Regions:
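Non-globular, low-confidence helical/coil segments that flank catalytic cores
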Residues: 2-13, 18-22, 27-327
Length: 327
């Protein structure tokens, strides 16, 4: 277990910005879907304007107050991503949902936490290892908000997800850099990406989220690659974080030295499958992290990784019981 005690002021924060948002209304006739996918032409998408650290701290021995606790669970979903967050205001957030084989596992994990509502669902990008289990999740819970990048693909997994969204009469909010999802009482969630609505590959359409609670900051990179990292740094966004969820499962296409130095994290979490076919994480990325003295926590080695923090304390632990859980 890793424990930290905060005894210094918060990292420098960005000035608050206000951005308009858009609601994406999907008008789909599923019976006419072809091999070209749900959105064979851009005219089939309708956008409607809407009102819509430095760390010198000693280890903590004090128990975190559950009523004011932020809990982040990096679920062990093999070669995929899924992060379940219980916010200190009682709301919940899910970032991605792994492959389809893990859908029921994710549903049970959320139910075991005592929640029946997901206030924020973030689908970073439409790759199967991020959206495969999402249909099962959407069917199992009350959903309030869904954020997705404005890109599409013709895969069956993506079409199944859109059909579930349609059948549940849910509305997608197109994600873009600068959106502030919430900001209250030292709690803030802001999107740093996507910036490009027509990326060369879907990884670079990924939603990147920065979550802050008091002086603790967390960065969730989806599968964003170095191209996106450069865009974010060019915009002079505040990327500093105590913990970064490494982009693209530790692929060498992500996690440039310049970006890691700007983030300056204590811990890097890598969501990755054991003995995966892609040889993730890349030895080059592991070397970069080690040379920058960033602790590495991997789901293939530890299982589900759980972070809890309040105003002054942060703890990291893992759930070995699910390390080799068959989904």
């Amino acid at each position: 277990m890793l424990k930290k005690n905060r005894n210094k002021t918060s990292r420098k924060k960005e000035k608050s910005k206000t951005f308009g948002s858009f609601l994406l209304v999907i008008l789909l006739l599923f019976s006419s879907c072809t091999n070209h996918g749900i959105f064979p032409d851009e005219t089939e998408r309708i956008f409607v304007s809407s009102v819509v650290t430095q760390h010198t701290a000693a280890p903590s021995t004090e128990k975190i107050d559950e009523k004011q606790t932020l809990t982040i669970s990096y679920l062990n979903v093999g070669q995929g991503d899924c992060i379940f967050i219980c916010l200190p205001n009682g709301e919940t957030m899910l970032i991605d949902a792994g492959t389809a084989s893990y859908g029921n596992h994710i549903v049970q994990y959320i139910k075991d936490s005592g929640n029946d509502t997901l206030n924020y669902v973030i689908i970073t990008h439409p790759h199967a290892d991020h959206i495969g289990g999402m249909s099962a999740v959407l069917k199992a819970f009350q959903i309030e908000q869904i954020y997705m990048p404005s890109v599409s693909t013709n895969t069956k997994t993506y079409q199944t997800l859109l059909q579930t969204i349609y059948e549940k009469n849910l509305t997608i909010q197109p994600a873009h850099a600068g959106m502030v999802l919430f900001e209250e009482k030292n709690l803030r969630g802001e999107l740093l990406a996507p910036m490009d609505t027509n990326p060369h590959n879907l990884n670079n359409a990924s939603i990147v989220l920065r979550l802050s609670y008091y002086s603790y900051d967390f960065l969730f990179m989806g599968d964003a690659e170095q191209e996106v990292e450069t865009q974010i740094l060019t915009e002079d966004a505040n990327v500093s974080a105590d913990i970064i969820k490494i982009g693209h499962h530790g692929s060498d296409t992500s996690s440039s030295v310049s970006f890691l130095k700007a983030v300056d994290p204590d811990v890097a979490v890598i969501s990755v499958g054991e003995d995966n076919a892609y040889d993730h994480p890349s030895p080059n990325v592991l070397t970069r992290l080690q040379e920058l003295q960033i602790d590495i926590w991997r789901t293939d080695e530890k299982g589900t990784i759980v972070v809890t923090c309040d105003k002054d304390h942060m703890e990291m632990d893992w759930e070995m019981s699910d390390k080799n859980l068959a989904a």
